[in-house]
Amino acid sequence: MNAVLDLLAESGQIEVDDIVTKLDVSAATARRDLDALASQQLLTRTRGGAVGQSVAYDLPIRYKREQHAPEKQRIALAASALVRRGDVVGLCGGTTSTAIATAFGARPDLAEPSPEPTLTVVTNAINIAAQLVMRPQIKTVVTGGVVHPRSYELVGPYSDIVLGQITIDIAFVGVNGIDPQFGATVHDEREAAINMLMARRAEHAVIVTDSSKIGRTAFATLGEPTLFDTLITDDRITREQRTAFEDAGLRVIVA
């Protein structure tokens, strides 16, 4: 059913015939999957297909986690390698950032007993905070705000208060699209505001995204393109795309 959600995410609507053709399944299987997803309130059934109850970015994070999972794991390891013991790290929400939090938890040097935190993570994602709180040597700071029910991210002015009073060594920000000309973009303007502020409070701001987002744009920009200094992505980025980002001033790390 994840594959059906992926198709739905592309255009916001899907027909049974499309599912049959693209996924090589029977019409009965396609209808059964649509009915099951409708029962979970992930889509609305129509005659001959379905429409999304929300646009692609609003699909619950548990369904987005499986998309490009190997790439996200490699990106997470590359991101973790940039972090030094004792750093203050900003982590916005999203599946790639969640993978980075997992990579932090697997680092032996961050699990060593210490009178001071081996790492401080500032996040607006409650799922990431819940994951890291199990690591006693990692200090977890939550921004505050109102929970976005599908992405688990905290948004709103309460987040601004916390972020406005701290400094961050390195921030990792996931995106819905990145383009050399338009920069980084996300679908939700409230999340964009938090991501942008976190990047501005950081000495180094890093975009983490799989290559499927390259060349795409979403609704809300994350400030000026020069706000970020590094892009970490997977090895499906083309040579032309990499050159375009490097010409725009971004360091590109291929995981």
Walk through the language-model features, giving the residues of each.
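Conserved phosphate- and dinucleotide-binding cores of soluble alpha/beta proteins
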Residues: A3-I19, D24-A28, S39, E71, ...
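HTH-adjacent hinge/linker in prokaryotic transcriptional regulators
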Residues: M1-D17, T21-T95, A101-V121, M134-Q137
